[in-house]
Regions:
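Extracellular polysaccharide-targeting segments
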Residues: 1-20, 124-176
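Extracellular glycan-recognition surfaces and repeat-rich motifs
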Residues: 11-39
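Extra-cytoplasmic beta-strand recognition segments
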Residues: 13, 38, 42-81, 106-110, ...
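Short, ordered beta-strand-loop transition motifs
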Residues: 28-37, 43-44, 86, 98-100, ...
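Extracellular beta-strand-rich recognition modules
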Residues: 65-69, 118-125
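Extracellular carbohydrate recognition and processing domains
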Residues: 89-118, 128
Length: 176
C-alpha cells in the first residue's frame, strides 16, 4: 500500500495556518457549498493577494509534487500561483488564471529542489477595487502517489495523515 500525504498543513482552510496579505486586501473565510474558502477582497488598488507561506519543516522534502486547489474569481480575473524561494530568489513553477465569474480546479506538477527555503501558495485577485479571489481544498502531494480518479489527497487533514482514499480505490461510477 502506498502512503498518500497532503503536505499542505491546512487543506480544508480551518485556520490552523494563518494566511498573510497586504493592507490593500481584506481576508476572510466564508463557507460556500459546504466548503471553507480563503477569500481575498481588494480594498484599494495595489498588491492584491492573500497567501500561505510554508517554511522550515513545513516544506515538503525535495521531489516532484502534484499541486491542486479549487479557485474562484469575481469582478475581475484572478490568478493562483505557487512560488518557491531557493538561494534567496523566487520562481513561479505554477500559475493559472481564473476567469471572472468562474470556479476552476487548478492542477499542476512542481519540483521542489533541495535547499528550498519557502513555498508560497497564493491567490491574487484582479487589481480592481471590489475584486475577489478565493481558494480552497489545497493539496501538495507527491506526484507518484497522486491519483485524480480518487480525488487526489486534498481531504487529508495534515502532513503525516493518510488520505481517506487510502482504504479503498474507488473509481468514477463505482457503487459507494
Amino acid at each position: 500500500m502506498t502512503l498518500r500525504i497532503n503536505w499542505f498543513p491546512d487543506p480544508n482552510i480551518t485556520h490552523t495556518v494563518q494566511p498573510s496579505a497586504p493592507s490593500t486586501v481584506k481576508v476572510d473565510f466564508p463557507v460556500v457549498a459546504r466548503r471553507n474558502w480563503l477569500r481575498a477582497t481588494v480594498l484599494t488598488v495595489g498588491d492584491t493577494y492573500a497567501q500561505y507561506s510554508l517554511q522550515g519543516d513545513r516544506i515538503p522534502p525535495a521531489g516532484t509534487y502534484h499541486v491542486h486547489c479549487c479557485a474562484f474569481a469575481k469582478h475581475a480575473n484572478a490568478f493562483t500561483r505557487v512560488y518557491m524561494k531557493v538561494g534567496g530568489k523566487y520562481t513561479v513553477p505554477l500559475q493559472k488564471e481564473i476567469a471572472d465569474g468562474t470556479t476552476v480546479d487548478v492542477d499542476g506538477t512542481i519540483t521542489i529542489p533541495d535547499g528550498c527555503e519557502e513555498l508560497i501558495v497564493r491567490i491574487a485577485a484582479g487589481n480592481v477595487v471590489g475584486a475577489i479571489g478565493m481558494m480552497s481544498d489545497i493539496l501538495i502531494e507527491r506526484a507518484d502517489t497522486y491519483d485524480a480518479a480518487v480525488g487526489g489527497g486534498f481531504r487529508a487533514s495534515s502532513p503525516g495523515t493518510r488520505c481517506r482514499a487510502h482504504r479503498s480505490v474507488r473509481r468514477a461510477g463505482d457503487v459507494r
